[in-house]
Structure formats: structure tokens, C-alpha cells
């Protein structure tokens, strides 16, 4: 069941990648090109989980897993820059100032620096959960592959994803209230909800990643095709 679920997530993320690539080719928006990088690895992340039971634990799956973690630490917060760029596209005067866009970029870089030590301090471990065979950053009682497998890793507070989610929601709320476009806010909100324990235990947080990315890309598509009237804020 969950293997199929991740395969579907991978296909949805692939559809978003193709859509974003098309948006970039049609509009030449730099932000669309920038976001293609994390979007590619969202496809990668879901599909490497989906094929885990086929490959089994071993060197191949181990090395297919690492790029997902590297991309998460390095580019997972680039949607913050996307949020600032979308506000510009939507005609918000304040977002046209260099200092404002610089603030979005500064927050992004700060979060990247925050996660930088993960590249040499974190490790990944074989885990078994439901029908999934994969590698993860920690092993808990619920994800042991055998009874005497040692518990390992630690669950750090996901600062970069949480900040990214709230920035996207904040920008999305501005779009909803001033431009009548609710989808970026709703995508961020559903991402936040899906990452809470009642939903994350059923792997719905990966669906939340589809929704937050989809809401942002929809905003890029929408505001590059509409004559954005200036909005003062």
C-alpha cells in the first residue's frame, strides 16, 4: 500500500517538474529555473522510497538515498526565494525593493548555513516501516528491521522546513487577501497540517510537499499570465 502511495507521489512530483519546466520555457522566469532543482529531488526522493522493496537494503539503495538528504539540506528552503519572487510578480510594490528581496534571500542562506553541518554529522540507517524498505536519518522502535537492531540517529527540530512553510503561508495570505488567489496559502497550510504526527504517520507529509509546491507553481503560472496591477502594502 505505502509503496504504491510513494509511487503516486513520485508521479505527481514529476508532473509538477514538467509543468515548472514548461513555465520556465514559456516565461523565462528565473525563479522557475531555480525551483527546478529542489523539484527534481522531490521526484527522486519519492521514487527512491517507492523502489526500496524492489532493491532491498544494500549499497545501491544506500547511495540512491543520500542525494535526497543532500538536496533537502541544501535546497529545501529555496521556496522562500520563490515566495518573494511571486509577490513581485503579483504586483506588490514593497516586494520590488532590493532590500525586501534581499531579506528573502538572506533568510534562505541562513537556513542553508544552519543545515550545513548535517553534511558531515548526519548518517542514514536501514529502516523497515509498513511495506517500505528504505534508509532514514534515524531508527526508532517502530522502524527497526529486526528486534535487536540498535536505535540510532536523532530527530532534530526541522527549522528550515518549518520556516519555509510559514513564509510561503505568509506570502500566500497576502496573495489571497489582496489578489484573491488562495492556493499558495492553502498549499502551505496543508503541508503544515500533513507534517503533524496524526498525518505524518501515514506518510501524508509527502502529499503535503506536492500541495505546497503545486500552490507555488500555480501562483507563478497565474501571475505571469495576468496583468498584475500594482498592489500597495
PLM regions: where:
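Hydrophobic transmembrane alpha-helical segments in integral membrane proteins
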Residues: 1-16
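Internal transmembrane alpha-helix with an interfacial aromatic "cap," most often the third helix
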Residues: 15-24, 44, 48-60, 70-104, ...
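Juxtamembrane "helix-exit" motif on the non-cytosolic side of transmembrane helices
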Residues: 25, 49-59, 115-125, 193-200
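Membrane-interfacial loop-to-transmembrane alpha-helix junctions, especially the N-terminal start
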Residues: 27-41, 96-104, 176-187, 228-232
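Aromatic-anchored segments of alpha-helical transmembrane domains
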Residues: 40-48, 107-117, 186-200
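Non-cytosolic membrane-interface motifs at loop->transmembrane helix junctions
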Residues: 58-70, 131, 203-211
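Membrane-proximal helix-loop-helix units in multi-pass membrane proteins
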Residues: 83-164
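C-terminal transmembrane-bundle signature of multipass membrane proteins
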Residues: 164-233
Amino acid at each position: 500500500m505505502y509503496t504504491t502511495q510513494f509511487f503516486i507521489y513520485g508521479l505527481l512530483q514529476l508532473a509538477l517538474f514538467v509543468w515548472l519546466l514548461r513555465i520556465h520555457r514559456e516565461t523565462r522566469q528565473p525563479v522557475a529555473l531555480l525551483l527546478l532543482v529542489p523539484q527534481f529531488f522531490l521526484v527522486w526522493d519519492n521514487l527512491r522510497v517507492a523502489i526500496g522493496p524492489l532493491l532491498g537494503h544494500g549499497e545501491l539503495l544506500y547511495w540512491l538515498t543520500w542525494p535526497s538528504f543532500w538536496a533537502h539540506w541544501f535546497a529545501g528552503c529555496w521556496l522562500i526565494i520563490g515566495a518573494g519572487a511571486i509577490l513581485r510578480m503579483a504586483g506588490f510594490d514593497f516586494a520590488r525593493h532590493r532590500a525586501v528581496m534581499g531579506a528573502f534571500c538572506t533568510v534562505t542562506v541562513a537556513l542553508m548555513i544552519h543545515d550545513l553541518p548535517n553534511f558531515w554529522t548526519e548518517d542514514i540507517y536501514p529502516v523497515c516501516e509498513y511495506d517500505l524498505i528504505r534508509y532514514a536519518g534515524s531508527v526508532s522502535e517502530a522502524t527497526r528491521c529486526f528486534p535487536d537492531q540498535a536505535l540510532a540517529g536523532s530527530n532534530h527540530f526541522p527549522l528550515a522546513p518549518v520556516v519555509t512553510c510559514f513564509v510561503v503561508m505568509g506570502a500566500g495570505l497576502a496573495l489571497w487577501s489582496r489578489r484573491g488567489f488562495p492556493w499558495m496559502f492553502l498549499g502551505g497550510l496543508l503541508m503544515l497540517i500533513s507534517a503533524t504526527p496524526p498525518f505524518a504517520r501515514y506518510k501524508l507529509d509527502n502529499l503535503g510537499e506536492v500541495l505546497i509546491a503545486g500552490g507555488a507553481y500555480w501562483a507563478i503560472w497565474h501571475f505571469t499570465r495576468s496583468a498584475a496591477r500594482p498592489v500597495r502594502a
